[in-house]
């Protein structure tokens, strides 16, 4: 039986198009029912236009900067959601997600080590496994046992590595344009028009150019080498959390057919294909992504 082509509103489950089919019940095996943890003490940071940022020490010289947002009732504390950005950028790329996500979740957006205001470990061995370990260390540092893990681009690959390595710490997984295998060296040096799509404004592209230019040469080399030499295929069956994979129908990072070769290997996964010529869908199609992510997580909790 041939695999049907999904449209922008179609979820694909195990490679078979199925619009809105609930996740199977055992998909919730890795979704721990736990109370939201209170935030741990951290150092407040006030710098530039950012307010309310904090840093935590992860050892080995790592000072990790992160932003935390909760816009729900002040007497409540939402379930934690960790948002992991991609290469050549910072936590700021999630600006389109915070207003709605933070009404329902305690949203934590770290600058991954080596990016933004976070330092990389001394003598860091650049690998997805080491980045996943640093994310786990971050959760430990702020007192979080498990969280919804959401990643974009390189952050999506790190998120998959984390979910496979720490299944009991992953409530749900969202991968927005995250590659499953090596990408060509220099892929993230593509023009912002390619990354953000034809609808991107000059001001938006200039801003992302600024984030790229502010990334250190050491980080660019390290992450570039890491992303041109990895393969997550053998780890995908180990991901136990309900998973939503998001891509675009005209992505220049990886085609829908390429995604369909790997996404079904994640046991409890769905694929959402949005109509876009950008491959950074977390930014270019933020509103549609958030709408579907909120619905997806809500469904997994109700199943």
Where do the model's predicted regions map?
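Catalytic active-site module of serine/aspartate enzymes centered on a nucleophile-bearing elbow/loop
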Residues: 275-303
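C-terminal segment of N-terminal export signals and the immediately downstream linker at the start
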Residues: 5, 26-59
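Conserved HGGG/HGGXW glycine-rich cap/lid loop of the alpha/beta-hydrolase fold
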Residues: 62, 69-117
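Short beta-strand/loop motif that positions the catalytic acidic residue
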Residues: 239, 245-247
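Hydrophobic, aromatic-rich cap/lid helix
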Residues: 207-234, 250
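Active-site loop/oxyanion-hole signature of alpha/beta-hydrolase fold enzymes
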Residues: 67-70, 109-150
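N-terminal secretory signal peptides and thylakoid transit peptides that target proteins
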Residues: 2-19
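Conserved hydrolase catalytic core segment
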Residues: 145-183
């Amino acid at each position: 039986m041939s695999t049907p082509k999904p449209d922008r509103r179609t979820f694909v489950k195990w490679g078979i198009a199925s619009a809105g089919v609930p996740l199977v019940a055992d998909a919730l095996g890795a979704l721990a029912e736990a109370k939201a943890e209170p935030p741990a003490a951290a150092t407040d940071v006030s710098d530039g236009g950012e307010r309310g940022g904090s840093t935590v020490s992860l050892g080995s010289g790592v000072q990790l900067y992160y932003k935390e947002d909760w816009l729900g009732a002040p007497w409540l504390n939402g379930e934690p959601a960790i948002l992991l950005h991609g290469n050549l950028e910072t936590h700021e790329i999630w600006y389109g997600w915070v207003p709605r996500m933070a009404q329902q979740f305690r949203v934590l957006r770290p600058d991954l080590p080596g990016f933004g205001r976070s330092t990389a470990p001394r003598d860091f061995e650049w690998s997805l496994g080491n980045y996943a370990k640093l994310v786990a260390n971050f959760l430990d540092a702020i007192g979080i046992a498990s969280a919804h893990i959401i990643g974009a681009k390189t952050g999506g690959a790190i998120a998959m590595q984390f979910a496979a390595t720490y299944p009991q710490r992953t409530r749900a997984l969202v991968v927005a344009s995250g590659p499953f295998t090596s990408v060509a060296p220099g892929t993230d040096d593509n023009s912002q028009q390619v990354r953000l799509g034809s609808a991107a404004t000059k001001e938006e592209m200039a801003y992302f150019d600024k984030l790229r230019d502010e990334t250190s040469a050491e980080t660019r080399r390290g992450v570039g080498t890491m992303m041109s030499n990895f393969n997550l295929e053998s780890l995908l069956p180990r991901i136990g959390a309900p998973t939503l994979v998001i891509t675009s129908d005209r992505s220049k990072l990886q085609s829908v057919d390429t995604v369909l070769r790997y996404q079904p290997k994640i046991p409890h996964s769905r694929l959402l294909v949005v109509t876009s010529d950008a491959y950074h869908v977390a930014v270019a199609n933020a509103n549609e992504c958030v709408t579907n992510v909120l619905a997806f997580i809500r469904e997994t909790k109700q199943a």
